[in-house]
UniProtKB/Swiss-Prot annotation:
GO molecular-function terms, A-Z: ATP binding; metal ion binding; threonine-tRNA ligase activity; tRNA binding
Gene it is expressed from: thrS
Bound cofactor: record note: Binds 1 zinc ion per subunit.
Listed name of the protein: Threonine--tRNA ligase
Domain TGS: 1-60
Lineage of the species this protein comes from: Bacteria, Thermotogati, Deinococcota, Deinococci, Deinococcales
PROSITE patterns assigned: AA_TRNA_LIGASE_II, TGS
């Protein structure tokens, strides 16, 4: 047999040869350094036979990214072995521990166990210690193939492994991997030796998991681990995890009293508290200003609609699994609104339209309802009731590019306003091999070309994604990277040829004939709830002045300064700034600490000197820390704060 190397050269090998045999044929140094391989683009290990004619690339420590799935998988086996040794030291025999599945996942692995006594989080460091000892033993990892009957004989007391084996085909060999006295059923691939595994790993947590994900099955104990090629990468990952916890919008939402989710109200139905409502209104006011300047007309539609409306639009029954069930009212059926677009189409259709009337831009902060599985709900970012900054533009073909550019400009402005500058675009176009799309070829080609031209004019990076278009038109997704390096899809601009056709809407053209308008869907925020959740984490609750629910805290040093503090608060309040006075009996330092805990951006401290000169001492939270200024004239500070609010800075 032969295999082909990356440079095109061919190696002649014995039948049944492995990637290790290929490495040895090239040279002893490579055989020593090799950790795994890819064969025809698929990850494999050094122990698995190669197919004749395979194109292979050997993996060494020089390309740790390629090696990561291998060492994470093998560390999962090392952990499983360590758990066995841990319970053996407690006096349990090998049959007392039963193992479920244990795959490698992004950044690490997990393994499910049925244990004789539960493992606690505080036990994980001891398991880690045993793992490091197993790595230090330098055990060879070997692979063997056996029959189904032989495989079943390996696990006479483990019903989970027996069930997995019973589900495998009778006529195919079953693979086992071993290291020392530990053996497990596994497809692989794995590292060649425990001694080559990195020490940069950590066991993170334990949780319960139903066997095979079925709640009718027993609950097993799942242990999660993470691993990276270097300690530096592990440290960076752990830091990011801690930072993510610090920024978690669910935690900050409670601490800053922004929102709550009450089980009596219902899962996935957030209640906006006064502070959160201020934040929400700042977002909506910002968007309303932009929409007014760009010629949008505001509309309001009901939260339910006749089921026939959604039948006509196609949202029912095609998306019924993500919608709440219809309700019977008299002789008609109604449904909680899953989308705003059908309602906006009916507003467009409420009177005759001429080519001179177009474009028609209809905008609404419309609340919609989707049925999300309870396990998928997450604070504000995954909910069942949410409000979209939804707008629909009805335009002529010759207006499409201009309208698309304007929406693109608006969305980029929104992201820049909130400090989200690491943005890339995804242009979703048709799959040339598919016939699922509605609309004619000429219109599709025009829309795709004009979207790409619009993106190029803006000058931001983009990728073209064939097959990513909806069946009713091409689209543009905005993907934003936050301060933690996580990517979020924020907002979509979608061209739609389907709804105008389904609702048979038209405009009278210059030629006196009826023509079909093109419809554009756009929502720069996506949803107010999700965008707010992302903003909370992006800013870690330290909102800029204009966005902060509580903008100014005035702190009198003593009770005799309370009247002056209240006078300043009233002036700021009349000017439109959200100001409060902390007239509690706490010491000044405690008042400052409380204001900082609540992430109030500006603190004004007033005492005898400030009162006499109508001044304030300013303590301001910034992205770089705390900035202090003493003896600031109050009127000058008020003007400065108003200017910052006006400029949304």
């Amino acid at each position: 047999m032969h295999v082909t190397l990356p440079d095109g050269k061919q190696l002649d090998l014995q039948p049944g040869a492995t990637a290790l045999d290929a490495a040895k044929a090239i040279g002893p140094r490579l055989a020593q350094d090799a950790l795994g391989a890819t064969a025809n683009g698929e990850l494999t290990d050094l122990m698995t036979p190669l197919s004749d004619g395979a194109s292979i690339t050997l993996i060494t420590k020089k390309n740790p990214g390629d090696a990561a799935p291998l060492f994470r998988h093998s560390l999962g086996h090392v952990m499983s072995q360590a758990v066995g040794e841990y319970y053996k030291a407690k006096g349990y025999g090998p049959d007392a521990i039963k193992r479920g599945v244990g795959p490698y996942i992004e950044n690490g692995w997990y393994q499910d166990f049925d244990l004789p006594e539960p493992l606690k989080e505080e036990d994980l460091p001891e398991i880690e210690k045993i793992m490091r000892d197993i790595i230090g033993r330098g055990l060879d990892i070997t692979r063997r193939e056996i029959s189904k009957d032989e495989a079943l004989a390996q696990f006479p007391h483990d019903p989970y492994k027996a069930e997995l084996i019973e589900g495998l085909p009778d006529d195919e060999p079953i693979t086992f991997y071993s290291q020392g006295d530990y053996t497990d059923l596994c497809r692989g691939p794995h590292f060649p030796s425990t001694g080559k595994l990195p020490q940069s790993f950590k066991l993170m947590s334990t949780s319960g998991a139903y066997w095979r994900g079925n709640e009718k099955n027993p609950i097993l104990q799942r242990i999660y681990g993470v691993a990276f090629a270097t300690q530096k990468e592990l440290d960076e990952y752990l830091f990011q995890l801690e930072e993510a916890k610090r920024r978690d919008h669910r935690k900050l939402g409670k601490e800053l009293e922004l929102f709550t989710i009450d089980p009596l109200v219902g899962k996935g139905l957030p209640l906006w508290l006064p502070n959160g409502t201020v934040l929400r209104e700042e977002l909506t006011n910002f968007m309303k200003e932009q929409q007014f300047q760009r010629g949008y007309q505001g509309v309001v539609t009901p939260n339910i609609g006749n089921l026939d409306l959604y039948r006509t639009s196609g949202h029912y029954p095609y998306y019924s699994e993500s919608q709440f069930n219809p309700i019977q009212v008299d002789e008609e059926e109604y449904m909680l609104k899953p989308m705003n677009c059908p309602h906006h189409v009916r507003i467009y259709a409420s009177k005759p339209r001429s080519y001179r009337d177009l474009p028609v831009r209809l905008a609404e902060f419309g609340t919609v309802y989707r049925y999300e599985q309870s396990g998928e709900l997450n604070g504000l970012t995954r909910v069942r009731g949410f409000t979209q900054d939804d707008a629909h533009i009805f335009c002529r073909p010759d207006q499409l590019k201009r309208e698309f550019l304007d929406v693109l400009d608006l969305t980029v402005l929104v992201l820049k306003t909130f400090g989200m500058t690491d943005v890339r675009f995804r242009v979703g176009v048709r799959d040339p091999e598919s016939d699922k799309y509605v609309g004619d070829e000429q219109n599709w080609a025009l829309a795709e070309r004009q979207i790409i031209e619009a993106v190029e004019e803006v000058g931001l990076p983009y990728t073209i994604e064939p097959g990513d278009a909806a069946f009713y038109g091409p689209k543009l997704d905005f993907v934003v990277k936050d301060v933690l390096g996580r990517e979020w899809q924020l907002g979509t601009i979608q061209v739609d040829y389907n709804l105008p056709e389904r609702f048979d809407i038209s405009y009278t053209g210059e030629d006196g004939q009826e023509h079909r308008p093109i419809m554009i869907h756009r929502a720069p925020f996506g949803s107010i709830e999700r965008f707010t959740g992302i903003l909370i984490e992006h800013y870690a609750g330290d909102f800029p002045l204009w966005l902060a629910p509580r903008q100014v805290m005035i702190i009198p040093i003593a009770d005799r300064h309370n009247a002056y503090a209240e006078e300043l608060r009233e002036e700021l309040h009349r000017a439109g700034l959200r100001a409060e006075v902390d007239d509690s009996s706490n010491r000044m330092q405690a008042k400052v600490r409380d204001a900082e805990l609540h992430k109030i951006p500006v603190m004004l401290i007033v005492g005898d000197k400030e009162q006499e000169a109508r001044e304030v001492s300013v303590r301001e939270r910034t992205g770089e820390g705390t900035k202090e200024r003493k003896g600031v004239k109050f009127d000058e500070l008020k003007a400065e704060l108003l200017e910052r609010r006006k400029n949304r800075s």
